Amino acid sequence: MELILSAGIGTLTASGVYLLLRPRTYQVIIGLSLLSFAVNLFIFGMGRLRVNAPPILDPGGVGDLARYTDPVPQALVLTAIVIGFAMTALFLVVLLASRGFTGTDHVDGREQRGD
C-alpha cells in the first residue's frame, strides 16, 4: 500500500512540476492542481492509513488508542480540497481575464517565436 501511494505521489509531483514549467497559463494551473493533489495524498498518508479503523472514539469508552486512526490529517485534506477547488476557479477566471486583455494565454503575455 505504501509503495503504491508513494509512486502515485511521485508521479503527481513530477507531472505537476513539468506542467508548472510550461509556457501556457492553463498548463500551469493544471500543474498547480496536480501538486496540490500530491501534497494532499502525502498528508493523508502520514495519518496512518488503516482499513476499517474509525477516526472517532466509541461512546462506550476510549479503549485502545492504537485501533483508531488520526482524524486531523483527514480534516486537513478535506479543507485543502475545498480551498484548492476555490483557488482553481479563481485562477481560471484570472486566466480568462488575462487572455481577454493580452490576446494570448502565455504566462509572460507574449507568443513564442520560432527562431
UniProtKB/Swiss-Prot annotation:
It is a multi-pass membrane protein. GO terms for biological process: potassium ion transport; proton transmembrane transport. It is found in: Cell membrane. One of its GO terms (cellular component) is plasma membrane. The keyword ATP-binding does not apply. It comes from the Bacteria. It holds the Pfam family Oxidored_q2. Keywords: Antiport, Cell membrane, Hydrogen ion transport, Ion transport, Membrane, Potassium, Potassium transport, Transmembrane, Transmembrane helix, Transport. One of its GO terms (molecular function) is antiporter activity. The chain crosses the membrane at residues 4-21, 28-47, 75-97. InterPro entries: CPA3_antiporter_subunitC, Mnh_C1_su, NUOK/Mnh_C1-like. PANTHER family: ANTIPORTER SUBUNIT MNHC2-RELATED. Part of a K(+) efflux system which is required for the adaptation of R.meliloti to alkaline pH as well as for the infection process during symbiotic nodule development. May form a hetero-oligomeric complex that consists of six subunits: PhaAB, PhaC, PhaD, PhaE, PhaF and PhaG. Belongs to the CPA3 antiporters (TC 2.A.63) subunit C family. This is Probable K(+)/H(+) antiporter subunit C. It comes from Rhizobium meliloti (strain 1021). The lineage of its organism: Bacteria, Pseudomonadati, Pseudomonadota, Alphaproteobacteria, Hyphomicrobiales. The gene is phaC.
